[in-house]
Structure formats: structure tokens, C-alpha cells
From Swiss-Prot:
Keywords (A to Z) from UniProt: Cytoplasm, Ribosome biogenesis
Family stated for the protein in its record: Belongs to the RbfA family.
Name of the protein in question: Ribosome-binding factor A
UniProt record, GO biological process: maturation of SSU-rRNA
Function: One of several proteins that assist in the late maturation steps of the functional core of the 30S ribosomal subunit. Associates with free 30S ribosomal subunits (but not with 30S subunits that are part of 70S ribosomes or polysomes). Required for efficient processing of 16S rRNA. May interact with the 5'-terminal helix region of 16S rRNA.
Organism: Chlamydia felis (strain Fe/C-56) (Chlamydophila felis)
Compartments it resides in: Cytoplasm
């Protein structure tokens, strides 16, 4: 139980550090011009690897390009984030897209279609 609490705290610290690096230090045009939210971090039990889940706005066609740029910049992001988190080993990070907007978009599209049908 104490180990789970420790991993949760480290997840939170790493999430904040990575979010700050993406916001302040990354100058890549496909990253800096997007609204990127680090939604969660999942560390392995040995704390050597971390899956970083992000949501990207605008979401339409740019999220794949932005995710590719994040993956290419993962080493730089991990290096800069490691300066703000004091761990013996900073985990190797990999980025994954968390698609939290699709259900909302789907509902909004359905409502839009209903409104259009009511007008006709």
C-alpha cells in the first residue's frame, strides 16, 4: 500500500514536471503552438519507464503530428523534467494520445444534426 502511494506521488510530480517543460521549454512549432495537457502518467513498478498520456487541442488533424513531435522530443523533455524532480533515475518516457474529446464531439455532432432536422 505504501509503495502504491509512493508511485502515485511520483506520477504526480513527473506529470507536473513534464507539463512545465512542454509549456515553457519546448520550442518545436508542432508542439508549442498547440494546447497540450498531460492528463496522467503511469510509471512501471521499477520506476524506470513511464507512459505519459496527453490530450491535444485543436484535435482535428493535428494530433497525430503533435504526438509524433512529442515522441521525437521525449529525450529532451525527460532531460529537462529530470532537473525539477529529484529521483535516483528519471524514467524513460513515451507519449500516448488520450482521446478524451471524441465522446464529447460525437454527442455535439448528434445534437447539431437534431437541430438541423428540427429546422427542416
Amino acid at each position: 500500500m505504501a509503495e502504491n502511494r509512493r508511485i502515485q506521488k511520483v506520477n504526480s510530480l513527473i506529470r507536473e514536471a513534464i507539463a512545465n517543460v512542454i509549456l515553457k521549454d519546448v520550442k518545436h512549432p508542432k508542439i508549442s503552438n498547440r494546447w497540450i495537457t498531460v492528463t496522467r502518467v503511469c510509471l512501471s513498478k521499477d520506476l524506470h519507464t513511464a507512459r505519459v498520456y496527453v490530450s491535444i487541442m485543436p484535435h482535428e488533424n493535428t494530433s497525430a503530428e503533435t504526438l509524433k513531435a512529442l515522441k521525437a522530443s521525449a529525450g529532451f523533455i525527460a532531460y529537462r523534467a529530470s532537473k525539477g524532480v529529484f529521483l535516483k533515475y528519471f524514467p524513460e518516457i513515451s507519449f500516448y494520445l488520450e482521446d478524451i474529446f471524441s465522446p464529447q464531439d460525437h454527442i455535439e455532432n448528434l445534437l447539431w444534426k437534431i437541430r438541423e432536422q428540427d429546422k427542416n
